[in-house]
C-alpha cells in the first residue's frame, strides 16, 4: 500500500499525529533486556598468582630442616656433617634454587663437577678456602675415584629421597637415582691381620716403645689399651675411645663391656648396641684394675684424657696406630688399618667354630635368621656370649701377659 500511495512511513505518521492531535515527540527505541540487574561488584583487588616454582622452598631451607631431623633421629654427628657438607657443594654447583626447579640436568652437572674435584680438598692447603669454580680453574687438579664419587652422589640421593617423602608436591621424583658410576671389581684381599702380622703388632718391645715408653706420645694409656681391647672385643675405634666407666661392670659372674647409645656416646647403627664379655687377656694386662681405679677417681670416661674432635674421640689413636703399623711393616693402604683388628676378631671366632649368630651378637651385626631376631631381641645372655664366644678367642703364640705395665706410674 505504501508503494502504491507514493508516501513514506513518516508521511503517514505525521498525518495521523495531525488528525488525532497527538503531540509529536522523539521516542527512544528500547531493546528488551531480560537479564537481571547487575549487582555492585565485590572490591577484590586482582593479584598476580605466583608460580609453583616461586613458592617452593629453596635448597638451603630444606637442608636445615633435613639436617635437624637427622640429628633428632640419633644419626651420628660425623655422618650428618658429611651429608651437610655435600649438600653445600650441591648448592654451590647448581645454585640455591627452589626445590621444584631442580632438573635432571642439575643432577648430571653435579656428578660431572664433583668428579673433577680433588678428594681431600678441604684438608689440603692448596685448595683450602677456594670455591669450587676457583679449584677447577687450577692446573694439575686430580679428580676422584669412582668409589668416592658414588659416596657423594649417595649423600645427595639420601637428601632428595627425604624431599620426595616429605615434599612430594615439589619433588615427585629423585633425579639422583641411577647416577652412580659403575666400579670395577677387584679381588681385594680381606683386611685381616695374619697371625704373623699380629706377632709383629703385639711384640712386647716395639709395642711398648710406641705407646707408654714413647716420650712424645700423648694419651699414652689410651694408645696402649685401645688396640688390645679392639682385638679382644671386636669393638670399633670410636666405640672404645668414647667408652664410659659405668659401661664396664660385672653382670652375674661375667665381667662385661656394654656398648650403648647415650647422650655422650654415638654408635654406627642402633643394632650396634650390645654387651661384650671381657677376655682373660684384658684382665691380664690390668684393664679391669685400671677401670676400677678410674671409677674411684670419679672419672666418667675410661680414657678421660682423650679430647673430642670433629670426628669423635678416636682421631689421634687411629693416627698413632697407623704410624705404628708402618713402623713394623704391616700397613697396607685401605687394607691393613685399625679396623682390621675388628675383622680379625670376627674371622678368628668363625674359624674357631663359633656360631655366626653368636658372632653377630658380639659385634652388633643384624641377625640374619628370623628366629634369632624374634627370640633374642634382648640379645644373648653374658654367660653364653662368654662360653660360646669370647672364651674360644685365642691368638696362637702371642703372650699378651708380657705387655702388662704399671699404669699407675703413668697417672702419677
State where each predicted segment sits.
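N-terminal helical hairpins
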Residues: 1-60, 64-72
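Basic, Lys/Arg- and aromatic-enriched nucleic-acid-binding interface segment
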Residues: 139-154, 174-237
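Short, charged phosphate-coordinating catalytic segments
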Residues: 161-174, 222, 230-253, 356-361
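Active-site/catalytic core of tyrosine-dependent DNA strand-transfer enzymes
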Residues: 198, 203-206, 262, 279-333
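Short, basic (Lys/Arg/His-rich) helix/loop patches that form interaction surfaces
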Residues: 209-216, 233, 296-301, 309-310, ...
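Conserved tyrosine-mediated DNA breakage-rejoining catalytic core shared by Y-recombinases
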Residues: 242-285
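Short, polar N-cap/turn motifs at the start of nucleic acid-interacting alpha helices
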Residues: 248-253, 335, 354-376, 397-410
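C-terminal secondary-structure termini that scaffold catalytic or DNA-interacting sites
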Residues: 280, 297, 368-369, 380-412
Amino acid at each position: 500500500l505504501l508503494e502504491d500511495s507514493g508516501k513514506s512511513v513518516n508521511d503517514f505518521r505525521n498525518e495521523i499525529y495531525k488528525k488525532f492531535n497527538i503531540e509529536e515527540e522523539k521516542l527512544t527505541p528500547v531493546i528488551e533486556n531480560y537479564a537481571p540487574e547487575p549487582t555492585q561488584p565485590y572490591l577484590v583487588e586482582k593479584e598476580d598468582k605466583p608460580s609453583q616454582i616461586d613458592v617452593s622452598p629453596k635448597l638451603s631451607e630444606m637442608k636445615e630442616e633435613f639436617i635437624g631431623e637427622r640429628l633428632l633421629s640419633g644419626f651420628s654427628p660425623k655422618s650428618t656433617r658429611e651429608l651437610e657438607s655435600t649438600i653445600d657443594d650441591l648448592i654451590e654447583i647448581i645454585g640455591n634454587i627452589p626445590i621444584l626447579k631442580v632438573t635432571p640436568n642439575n643432577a648430571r652437572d653435579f656428578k660431572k663437577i664433583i668428579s673433577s674435584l680433588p678428594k681431600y680438598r678441604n684438608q689440603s692447603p692448596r685448595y683450602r678456602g677456594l670455591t669450587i669454580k676457583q679449584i677447577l680453574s687450577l692446573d694439575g687438579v686430580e679428580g676422584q675415584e669412582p668409589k668416592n664419587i658414588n659416596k657423594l652422589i649417595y649423600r645427595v640421593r639420601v637428601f632428595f629421597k627425604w624431599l620426595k617423602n616429605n615434599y612430594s608436591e615439589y619433588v615427585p621424583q629423585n633425579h639422583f637415582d641411577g647416577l652412580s658410576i659403575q666400579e670395577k671389581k677387584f679381588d681385594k684381599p680381606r683386611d685381616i691381620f695374619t697371625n704373623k702380622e699380629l706377632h709383629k703388632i703385639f711384640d712386647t718391645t716395639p709395642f711398648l716403645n710406641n705407646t707408654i715408653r714413647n716420650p712424645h706420645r700423648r694419651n699414652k694409656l689410651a694408645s696402649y689399651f685401645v688396640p688390645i681391647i679392639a682385638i679382644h672385643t671386636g669393638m670399633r675405634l670410636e666405640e672404645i675411645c668414647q667408652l664410659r666407666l659405668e659401661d664396664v661392670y660385672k653382670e652375674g659372674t661375667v665381667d662385661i663391656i656394654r656398648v650403648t647409645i647415650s647422650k655422650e656416646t654415638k654408635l654406627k647403627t642402633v643394632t650396634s648396641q650390645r654387651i661384650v664379655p671381657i677376655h682373660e687377656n684384658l684382665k691380664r694386662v690390668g684393664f679391669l684394675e685400671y677401670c676400677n681405679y678410674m671409677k674411684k677417681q670419679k672419672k666418667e670416661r675410661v680414657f678421660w684424657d682423650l679430647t673430642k674432635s670433629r670426628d669423635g674421640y678416636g682421631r689421634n689413636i687411629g693416627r698413632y696406630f697407623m704410624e705404628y703399623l708402618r713402623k713394623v711393616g704391616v700397613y697396607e693402604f685401605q687394607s691393613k688399618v685399625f679396623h682390621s683388628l675388628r675383622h680379625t676378631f670376627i674371622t678368628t671366632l668363625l674359624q674357631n667354630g663359633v656360631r655366626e649368630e653368636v658372632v653377630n651378637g658380639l659385634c652388633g651385626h643384624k641377625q640374619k635368621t628370623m628366629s634369632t631376631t624374634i627370640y633374642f631381641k634382648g640379645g644373648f645372655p653374658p654367660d653364653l656370649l662368654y662360653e660360646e664366644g669370647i672364651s674360644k678367642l685365642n691368638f696362637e703364640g702371642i703372650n699378651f701377659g708380657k705387655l702388662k705395665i704399671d699404669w699407675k706410674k703413668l697417672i702419677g
